[in-house]
Amino acid sequence: MVKGLEKFNELVESFANLPTIGKKTAIRLAYHLCINNQIDGMKLAHNIENAIRFIKPCEQCGALSENELCEICSDEERNKNILCIVESPKDILTLEESQSYNGLYFVLDELNEEKLEKLKQIILKLNISELIFALTHSINSDATIFFIEDKFKGLNLTFSKIAQGIPSGVNLENVDLISLNKAMNFRTKI
């Protein structure tokens, strides 16, 4: 770090603490905001403060929200019969960006009795008919799916999980064996 520039060094350190930001990028960002574009720097500081103060988890699903209920849970146009279970609010952002799903969500960031009871109450309250699991593929997620299926088998639900396989534009030589195996075993007719 540069001696005599404590504020600059603190800013660099703050940027470097963010995911995927290394020291060189942190220095570039700090320099840009302090020297090249101070107005954007002040705007960024204001936006960060507002986001930290006003964004919280939706009380129903756990998505990012500025209100008790997020826009998704409040939207009357959404299909209220299906519930997609995800691992984090970031997953909701990704699915929403894809515009491939129009139902509700539930963030299952940890598997405990409190979360399971909350999930059950939402299923009963909203008369959910299908649970879609959109979890990272792993042995743990498979066990979680099996556990939830078993726990809620008496609720007359359909259970499904998102398809897995080979991403678009990826050569077979670059695909891991588990994904390749799943893609072959769960292939679809054309």
UniProtKB/Swiss-Prot annotation:
InterPro entries: DNA_Rcmb_RecR, Rcmb_RecR, Rcmb_RecR_Znf, TOPRIM_dom, TOPRIM_RecR
GO BP, sorted A to Z: DNA recombination; DNA repair
Gene Ontology MF annotations: DNA binding; zinc ion binding
Keywords, comma-separated and alphabetical: DNA damage, DNA recombination, DNA repair, Metal-binding, Zinc, Zinc-finger
Domain Toprim: 81-167
Superkingdom, taxonomy of origin: Bacteria
Residue spans, zinc finger C4-type: 58-73
SUPFAM superfamilies with a match to the protein in the record: Recombination protein RecR
Its job: May play a role in DNA repair. It seems to be involved in an RecBC-independent recombinational process of DNA repair. It may act with RecF and RecO.
Family: Belongs to the RecR family.
NCBIfam families hit by this protein: recR
HAMAP family in the record: RecR
Protein name: Recombination protein RecR
Organism: Campylobacter jejuni subsp. jejuni serotype O:23/36 (strain 81-176)
